[in-house]
């Protein structure tokens, strides 16, 4: 049976993640409050930010920036978008 949670981003009951995506308290918080759908949406957005802003995951400042954007993304705050990116038509 799929575990459901009240998603912090989408404010509705949705299927949760199968396991915490990070170790420690941060991973447990995401596991408890972020749906699998929201996590998948974040991974796509994270990839877009890394590529478009040319972030280097070996650089501590870039990792800190991305972690801050992830918090904003899940909490509903205004988060960074890739400059000039136009999503494909559906």
From Swiss-Prot:
Q: Give yes or no: UniProt keyword Iron.
A: yes
This entry carries the following GO cellular component terms, namely: cytosol
Q: Name one GO biological process term.
A: cellular response to oxidative stress
Secretion signal, residue range per the UniProt entry: none
Keywords noted in UniProt? Iron
Q: State any single GO MF term.
A: iron ion binding
Query: SUPFAM superfamilies, alphabetically?
Result: YggX-like (SSF111148)
Which Pfam families does the UniProt entry name for this protein? Iron_traffic
**Protein family membership:** Belongs to the Fe(2+)-trafficking protein family.
List the HAMAP family hit by this protein, alphabetically.
Answer: Fe_traffic_YggX
Tell me, in a sentence or two, what this protein's role is: Could be a mediator in iron transactions between iron acquisition and iron-requiring processes, such as synthesis and/or repair of Fe-S clusters in biosynthetic enzymes.
Q: List the protein's name.
A: Probable Fe(2+)-trafficking protein
Species name: Pseudomonas fluorescens (strain SBW25)
